Amino acid sequence: STGTITRFRDTRDPKPRGRNIFWFYRPETLAEWLQKDKSLRTRLLDIPVLNEAGLRPAQIKAVKNLEQSFKKNKPKALIQMATGAGKTFTACTFVYRLLEHAKAKRILFLVDTKNLGEQAEQEFMAFVPNDSNRKFTEFYNVQRLTSSYIATDSQVCISTIQRMYAILKGEELDEGAEDTNPNESTWMEQQRNKKQAMPVEYSPKVPIEQFDFIVIDECHRSIYNLWKQVLDYFDAFLIGLTATPDKRTFGF
């Protein structure tokens, strides 16, 4: 670390290479990692072949390509699927596989409206993996954030990007801020006008290693400007989901 830029390299990785991190990890996190024989990036290589039963061709392609991207240690991936192609079901499928086979600790599912968060929660609650006859929620805890509290026993956290931004800023979220796309709401304008709206600073309550993966739903609306700070804060693989990417989205 130079005091301004901090880089980290895990020599247990298949092809160790440094990466920039927002802040350094907690000592207890490093101690926990040292007790494990394999790093997350090594465990990603151990993900078994996908069981294709019950999946559409587009869903199969998306999951396979995503996992191949992870195995190449690419930090970002973009999944483009047409509306109605089962984007959230696809997300449930690869989230399950990351938790079950790569032993991911916690995954953040980011949306930009409360309604989309509720829909995602219902999808996860109804999801039954094709290698089991039990529901996903019988294996893993799903929490939709309605306050700043992130349960320590949750494996999937669903949150609006507005709420996660407010959590990192240590601020209360305005009532109604999650009801509409923030880029079209007065709340976004209020944040821009605040003298201390930027930048996000390190929060000991939410360490950078809180999530191993971040799934960004409707990412064509949520990966720029104010919101990019949320994505840059965490040391996590990023997975963008969209049906309507633009040129900036492909640059993600």
Please annotate each region the language model reported.
Residues 149-150, 205:
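Short amphipathic alpha-helix with an adjacent loop that forms part of the alpha/beta core around
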Residues 2, 59, 84, 113, ...:
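Conserved structural-core and active-site-/substrate-pathway-adjacent residues in large, well-folded domains
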Residues 162-252:
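Signature of the SF2 helicase/ATPase Hel1-core->accessory helical subdomain module
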Residues 109:
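Conserved SAM-binding loop
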Residues 1-106, 115, 119-131, 152-156, ...:
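ATP-dependent helicase/translocase motor core
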Residues 131-139, 239-240, 248:
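Acidic/polar loop patches that form or flank catalytic/metal-binding clefts of enzymes
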Residues 114, 136-147, 161-166:
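Conserved helicase motor
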Residues 94, 123, 141-146, 225-227:
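Short beta-alpha junctions and helix-cap segments that line functional grooves
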